[in-house]
A protein has these predicted regions:
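Vicinal oxygen chelate
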Residues: 2-12, 32, 40-42, 46-51, 55-79, 96-101, ...
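Amphipathic alpha-helical segments
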Residues: 14-29, 75-81
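Short, Lys/Arg-rich nucleic-acid/phosphate-binding segment
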Residues: 36
């Protein structure tokens, strides 16, 4: 295979603000090499990037992040306190996840790490 996933980019009217929020959530560093028009979060092998778009595409996300947490309930509480919005709590006793939105309205999901790894 010749492709390597390097970055996931999100359009937003506020790249710096959204990058700062995500960096605080995933423990990454904000890198701003283009004076605020394209801002990256470095927090592991795949970077998150945020680029200026004054009119993001309306409607449901066609792509979203799936994250895992060792303590799902505590992590969801922390994200909500940090400004995430709750969309839905989903799943059953075998696999639970929560769909949230970041401050710009982009959906993402958080699942229990142990349950997610058991399903792989």
């Amino acid at each position: 295979m010749t492709l390597t996933l390097a970055m996931v980019t999100c359009d937003t009217p506020d790249p710096k603000g959204l990058a700062s929020w995500w960096a605080a959530q995933v423990g990454g560093d904000v890198v701003d090499p283009f004076d605020g028009s394209y801002v990256m979060v470095v927090a592991g092998p795949v970077r998150l990037a945020f680029q200026v778009d004054e009119a993001p595409t309306p409607g449901k996300n066609r792509l979203h992040l799936d994250l895992t947490a060792t303590d799902l309930d505590a992590e969801v509480d922390r994200l909500l306190a940090a400004g995430a919005g709750l969309v839905a709590r989903r799943g059953d006793e075998n696999f639970r996840w929560v769909t949230l939105t970041d401050p710009a309205g982009n959906e993402f999901c958080v699942a229990s790490a142990a349950e997610a790894e058991a399903d792989l």
